[in-house]
């Protein structure tokens, strides 16, 4: 008699099945149903078959925060090096001189691009950077009202609300004018003694390049100016530091980081020197070691894991160090002339896109100049029909801002990759659909 039979006999049962008789069959473990084992080459064949179902080669006219841009292969090579790829937040920072230097270089590059005094080591993404900026403004002046443009996307507003609700801060929207730009009179009427900060976007949520942001420093009174910018656009547009921004933030995905579904992004935050000790996250600085050699250190690390919770400025945990390396590498490879070229190509292709759609009767909502995202008047929801033709595009504004008065507004996006051939394919598809 084998061991199992002996145990069954001792227990007075006939099979192991009786041990689980009180467990319903519907919740018991079953065969997974993946079939028998395959040889290596057959596994690869199966994987390729599944991969072929992906829609990776579709023409892309999507944007509104995440963009399809050219990424130099050198960027991918650098961030794939195991010394960086496997690194976590350096808790003994001086040991990780390479990682610290890469963050220091990133901070320097962004500060130069934004024309701001300091840049922190990173935030999670652009939206969380906005939330942290609002909290930073509260720490600076103790006031409880934030003014944001009506072109702010609902998802961004939701994150902002989540960040400031514990401070009992009030979020109030100001109007945009018929050009899709800041309504200066309306904004000015809302700024009072309780206003902690005015948030501006350039380009804004309508995709419009808004020169009215240059006037805000004249009317903001004692409140702070928080500027949410597109880093690629700064290749040609005036940087936030040159129009009086106290805090400048951005989503850094465009700087050498691929598009992804639920993966990591990069929150950029820069600020004036006066506010450095109110800033969240970490700040890497340059010093010298005991031998007088150049060394890098965590100059500030005011998060709750490092200092007393009551004194911490943020509970941000892991920084986005690998993505700051990608952004720093991207900016270093392109240089100022390369970034300017990418920005100019983006504007050129956006203009070509608008003219081409205009030729078939699809007009822009605003006559103003757009950067990447352009809002068109299209009553029909064309997104699914375009997808069937291998084209991604046609985001409805009301899917981004539910109560927007521009119900017919539909976005199409251009980058440096959007050449005339791709635009022609979109035009041909829309002519059939419309």
UniProtKB/Swiss-Prot annotation:
Gene3D superfamilies: Aspartate Aminotransferase, domain 1, Type I PLP-dependent aspartate aminotransferase-like (Major domain). Its EC number is 1.4.4.2. The keyword Oxidoreductase applies. One of its GO terms (biological process) is glycine decarboxylation via glycine cleavage system. InterPro entries: GcvPA (IPR023010), GDC-P_N (IPR049315), PyrdxlP-dep_Trfase (IPR015424), PyrdxlP-dep_Trfase_major (IPR015421), PyrdxlP-dep_Trfase_small (IPR015422). It comes from the Archaea. Coiled coil: none annotated. Keywords: Oxidoreductase. HAMAP family: GcvPA. The glycine cleavage system catalyzes the degradation of glycine. The P protein binds the alpha-amino group of glycine through its pyridoxal phosphate cofactor; CO(2) is released and the remaining methylamine moiety is then transferred to the lipoamide cofactor of the H protein. This is Probable glycine dehydrogenase (decarboxylating) subunit 1.
